[in-house]
């Protein structure tokens, strides 16, 4: 409380004094050894100005950069050092130290048609990804990603990523779900490059290490509040420094959002507690649309009772799912791919087994993942992390007994709509329009390469390909050092007012209580299987919960490391994502990919692709559902929906588009 009595100018003075002392100390201690490229406080020669134009209660600092990246996971780091490498004065804002980002938790691998295990072709990878998306993916973006995949993996290898190897010294590639050879006619593909079962950990640390070569200014433990938008253009970001409570406005010609997904809208998920849809919500508050948020991936194998991820790589190495009768039940649901069918197919199959009484345990509410038939040496070399995780969270020795698993929320296919260059788009009068100065990549974005369902090991690929694409696109559009667009003197005023409102919120409901209500509503009303009545009830419940945001109570009135307020800011972001997710799901009256409606069990395309389309009348755009959902939320929490067409054309003649067909494995 004593801090409240100190003038903001004095607080800022103290903070800058401490910063200067630490920087000088660091520079002195290591200058003799090497040039110092990294500091959590940003580059030493960065010009920053103190302002009181939007608040007299908080220190406000203005920064100018060519580009600012929000988020320092795989996508954010790749975008940030790509921009710095091209000569752009770049800031990277992150609420976590970079290596704490959720990319670190990815286990299975990264897809690329290297052909190290058998002949492969990136066009076959393209086909599998389009099919996996249930024909909701944009084929120009999928073309770009799969064609760039081999070069992206080789680039990572050159950066020092320690891939697992074959006996011949090549990058080891394992089987993964939904992957095939020869356009689905050549059997199972081995396309997933991995570092045992800790691929995300290696990827993130490799990219972070690479990023230290460049003079990117990192602002670590800064919470991005909102975009600075003027006249339909993005001109930067406003953020809160959590360490000292100061406000920072980053004016930039280009802004890249790489803030990850919003898995924490659900009660049980594999996501870190920091996956709160911050960038998605920032875009929503800016009046821009989000795309396809109803498509939430349930990973088939989360540890029962804990929700921790058990990688698909287990099944790629030969693991099998069994029910209470000891039956390898996936043989009934996917006779060809079996346990390596696409994730949405496996999750639904597991749920059906449990519903029909063939689940395991006394409550019949999970199934088993069996690994103990595999050689212990294989488990030790290929799945060491899983062996450890299963012992810690399930008390299971994988060499002797099966792991109890059930479907768990894992990934968000939807996000901020972009084109294949990473440029954020809106849809106006039937046409896609680029939002000047705004880019997005990674799980925060929807390019849309995943459509209605993501293939395993395409997410890490998405990060590096489109993180790099954002940097390349900005380099095509701009030059380093160009004049920056102006911002209004009071830009960000509403963000600071909201922060202050939450800091002194004195209602009757705790943030944690409201968050739990939201998460349990999403868990029960927008699950693996969905029905109209349950979704509608969920929409109504979430609307009530959102209204209760006005009755929040926070307890910490300070400005230094006020985690109470930060969690409440994250709840605001989660709520915007949850509202759009469940309303979009209620409106989509079909089953496609991860969106499975029990009252609308079939996919509704422009034609009935179960039979020849010759002689069929093509459905109008309003009559079918092979289209992207665009969702908006107004200041009162009301969701409105629009739709935009799926892009079926590829980038060029090197790759033919894949027409819709019945999806089976």
Curated annotation (Swiss-Prot):
Write out the GO biological process terms: mitochondrial electron transport, succinate to ubiquinone; tricarboxylic acid cycle
Report which superkingdom the organism of origin falls in: Eukaryota
Question: Could you say which EC number(s) this protein's record lists?
Answer: 1.3.5.1, 1.1.5.-
**Bilayer topology:** Peripheral membrane protein
Q: Which UniProt keywords apply?
A: Electron transport, FAD, Flavoprotein, Membrane, Mitochondrion, Mitochondrion inner membrane, Oxidoreductase, Transit peptide, Transport, Tricarboxylic acid cycle
Q: How is its activity regulated?
A: Enol-oxaloacetate inhibits the succinate dehydrogenase activity.
Residues holding oxaloacetate: 299, 343, 410, 454, 457
Residues annotated as binding FAD are 72, 75, 94-95, 101, 103, 108, 224, 278, 443, 459-460
Cofactors (names): FAD
What general EC class does the enzyme of this chain belong to?
Answer: oxidoreductase
Family annotation (InterPro entries): FAD-dep_OxRdtase_2_FAD-bd (IPR003953), FAD/NAD-bd_sf (IPR036188), FRD_SDH_FAD_BS (IPR003952), Fum_R/Succ_DH_flav-like_C_sf (IPR037099), Fum_Rdtase/Succ_DH_flav-like_C (IPR015939), SdhA/FrdA/AprA (IPR030664), Succ_DH/fumarate_Rdtase_cat_sf (IPR027477), Succ_DH_flav_su_fwd (IPR011281)
Instruction: List the subcellular locations.
Output: Mitochondrion inner membrane
GO cellular component entries: mitochondrial inner membrane; respiratory chain complex II (succinate dehydrogenase)
Reactions performed catalytically = a ubiquinone + succinate = a ubiquinol + fumarate; (R)-malate + a quinone = enol-oxaloacetate + a quinol; (S)-malate + a quinone = enol-oxaloacetate + a quinol
**A Pfam family:** Succ_DH_flav_C
Q: Which GO terms describe its molecular function?
A: electron transfer activity; flavin adenine dinucleotide binding; succinate dehydrogenase (quinone) activity
What pathway does the annotation place this protein in?
A: Carbohydrate metabolism; tricarboxylic acid cycle; fumarate from succinate (eukaryal route): step 1/1
User: Which residues does the Swiss-Prot or TrEMBL entry list as transit peptide?
Assistant: 1-45
- Fetch the SUPFAM superfamilies from UniProt: FAD/NAD(P)-binding domain (SSF51905), Succinate dehydrogenase/fumarate reductase flavoprotein C-terminal domain (SSF46977), Succinate dehydrogenase/fumarate reductase flavoprotein, catalytic domain (SSF56425)
Catalytic center residues: 343
Question: Residue positions of the PTM Tele-8alpha-FAD histidine?
Answer: 102
Give the record's subunit note.
Component of complex II composed of four subunits: a flavoprotein (FP), an iron-sulfur protein (IP), and a cytochrome b composed of a large and a small subunit.
Its biological function? Answer: Flavoprotein (FP) subunit of succinate dehydrogenase (SDH) that is involved in complex II of the mitochondrial electron transport chain and is responsible for transferring electrons from succinate to ubiquinone (coenzyme Q). SDH also oxidizes malate to the non-canonical enol form of oxaloacetate, enol-oxaloacetate. Enol-oxaloacetate, which is a potent inhibitor of the succinate dehydrogenase activity, is further isomerized into keto-oxaloacetate.
> What does the sequence similarity comment in the record state about its family?
Belongs to the FAD-dependent oxidoreductase 2 family. FRD/SDH subfamily.
What is this protein's name? Succinate dehydrogenase [ubiquinone] flavoprotein subunit B, mitochondrial
């Amino acid at each position: 409380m004593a801090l409240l009595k100190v003038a903001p100018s004095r607080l800022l003075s103290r903070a800058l004094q401490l910063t200067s002392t630490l920087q000088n100390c660091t520079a002195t201690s290591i200058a003799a050894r090497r040039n110092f490229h990294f500091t959590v406080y940003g580059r030493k020669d960065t010009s920053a100005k103190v302002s009181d134009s939007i608040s007299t209660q908080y220190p406000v600092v203005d920064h100018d950069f060519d580009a600012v990246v929000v988020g320092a996971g795989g996508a954010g780091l790749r975008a940030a050092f790509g921009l710095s490498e091209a000569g752009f004065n770049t800031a990277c804002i992150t609420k976590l130290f970079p290596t704490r980002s959720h990319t670190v938790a990815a286990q299975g691998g990264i897809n690329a048609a290297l052909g190290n295990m058998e002949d492969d072709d990136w066009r076959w990878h393209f086909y599998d990804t389009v099919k996996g998306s249930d024909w909701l993916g944009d084929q120009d973006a999928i073309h770009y990603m799969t064609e760039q995949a081999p070069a992206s993996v080789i680039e990572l290898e050159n950066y020092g990523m320690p891939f697992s190897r074959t006996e011949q010294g090549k990058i080891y590639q394992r089987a993964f779900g939904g992957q095939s050879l020869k356009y689905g006619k050549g059997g199972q593909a081995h396309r997933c490059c991995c570092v045992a079962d800790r691929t995300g950990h290696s990827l993130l640390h490799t990219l972070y290490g690479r990023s230290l070569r460049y003079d990117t200014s990192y602002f670590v433990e800064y919470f991005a509040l909102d975009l600075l938008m003027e006249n339909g253009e993005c001109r930067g970001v406003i953020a809160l420094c959590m360490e000292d409570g100061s406000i920072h406005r980053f004016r930039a010609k280009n802004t890249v959002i790489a803030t990850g997904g919003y898995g924490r809208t659900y009660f049980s998920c594999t996501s870190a507690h920091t996956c709160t849809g911050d960038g998605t919500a920032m875009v929503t508050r800016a009046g821009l649309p989000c795309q396809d948020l109803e498509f939430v991936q349930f990973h088939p194998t989360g540890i029962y009772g804990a929700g921790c991820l058990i990688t698909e790589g287990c099944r790629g190495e030969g693991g099998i799912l069994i029910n209470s009768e000891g039956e390898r039940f996936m043989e009934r649901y996917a006779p060809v791919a079996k346990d390596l069918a696409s994730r949405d197919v496996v999750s639904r199959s597991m749920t059906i087994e449990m519903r029909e009484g063939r689940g395991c345990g006394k409550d019949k509410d999970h199934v088993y993942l069996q690994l103990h038939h595999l050689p212990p040496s294989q488990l030790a070399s290929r799945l060491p992390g899983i062996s450890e995780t299963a012992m810690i969270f399930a008390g299971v020795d994988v060499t002797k007994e099966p792991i109890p698993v059930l479907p768990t929320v894992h990934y968000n296919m939807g996000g901020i709509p972009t084109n294949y260059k990473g440029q954020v788009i809106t849809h106006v009068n039937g046409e896609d329009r680029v939002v000047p100065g705004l880019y997005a990549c990674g799980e925060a974005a929807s390019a849309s390469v995943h459509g209605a369902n993501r293939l395993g090991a395409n997410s890490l690929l998405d990060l590096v390909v489109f993180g790099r694409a954002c940097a390349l696109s900005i380099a095509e559009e701009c030059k380093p050092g160009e004049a920056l667009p102006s911002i209004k003197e009071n830009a960000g005023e509403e963000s600071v007012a909201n922060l202050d409102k939450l800091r002194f919120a004195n209602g009757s409901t705790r943030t944690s209580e409201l968050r739990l209500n939201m998460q349990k509503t999403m868990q029960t009303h927008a699950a693996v299987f969905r029905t109209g009545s349950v979704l509608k009830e969920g929409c109504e419940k979430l609307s009530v919960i959102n209204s209760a945001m006005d009755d929040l109570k926070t307890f910490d009135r300070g400005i230094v490391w006020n985690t109470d307020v930060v969690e409440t800011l994250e709840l605001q972001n989660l709520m915007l994502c949850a509202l759009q997710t469940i309303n979009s799901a209620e409106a989509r009256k079909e089953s496609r990919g991860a969106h499975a409606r029990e009252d609308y069990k079939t996919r509704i395309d422009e034609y009935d692709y179960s039979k020849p389309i010759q002689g069929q009348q093509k459905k109008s755009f309003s009559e079918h559902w092979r289209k992207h959902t665009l969702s908006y939320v107004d200041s009162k929490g009301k969701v409105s929906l629009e739709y935009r067409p799926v892009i079926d054309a590829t980038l060029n003649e090197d790759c033919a588009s894949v027409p819709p067909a019945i999806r089976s494995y």
